[in-house]
Amino acid sequence: MNPIICALDTQDLNEAISLANTLRDKVGMIKLGLEFFAAHGPSGVREVAKCNVPTFLDLKLHDIPNTVAKTVEAIKVLNIEILTLHISGGTKMLEEALSIVKDTKTKLIGVTVLTSMSNEDLSELGIAREVKSQVILFAKLAKKVGLHGIVCSALEAQEVYQECGKDFKIITSGIRVGFGHDDQKRTATPKEAINSGADYIVIGRPITKSNSPANSAELILKSLS
């Protein structure tokens, strides 16, 4: 299994298609986010899917249960591999979303605490727990409800693995290669993430903005062995 999920963070459909074609044999999955979906909608997802690479649609859904269920109903026809939603939406929202995809190949993955957030950010929201404790709480709820796994940072992955077991998938974002700075606060290298128990690592710009995306993906994969 190739654990690399390449984030195609672009509004440019042609660029997304070109990257998907270039990387389809180099990564395990490609990720399309809210930026792409807002620009191109379901038709854009279908176009990228024609490149024959598994697709992860990262919409981080969070609304009342009925609205999320209807949204998942509309999305499930896209035949994607993974769809994300916020665990903080609560048990009923998660259960209703799961009921929609039960006969499809789409796996629902829960978002715990965004990797752009710190303990101080949680405190500002009135959440007394530290990030790691909040992630573990969300992970246990996600497993109890029946989600296929979660998204967290590598800093929490080992404890999630210990609490939830090997069949509960862990996708780590906030992965950094070399020296780069952005709005991520809880970061790790690809090797650190895999060693901590992650099943998949999400990597964007270190691959997509390199001179050779295919070569960069190959080098990252080799670094994991």
From Swiss-Prot:
Belongs to the OMP decarboxylase family. Type 1 subfamily. The active site is at K60. SMART domains: OMPdecase (SM00934). Pathway: Pyrimidine metabolism; UMP biosynthesis via de novo pathway; UMP from orotate: step 2/2. One of its GO terms (biological process) is 'de novo' pyrimidine nucleobase biosynthetic process. It catalyses: orotidine 5'-phosphate + H(+) = UMP + CO2. GO terms for molecular function: orotidine-5'-phosphate decarboxylase activity. Its EC number is 4.1.1.23. It comes from Wolbachia sp. subsp. Brugia malayi (strain TRS). This is Orotidine 5'-phosphate decarboxylase. Keywords: Decarboxylase, Lyase, Pyrimidine biosynthesis. It comes from the Bacteria. Catalyzes the decarboxylation of orotidine 5'-monophosphate (OMP) to uridine 5'-monophosphate (UMP). Homodimer. Coiled coil: none annotated. GO terms for cellular component: cytosol. Substrate binds at residues 9, 31, 58-67, 115, 176, 184, 204-205.
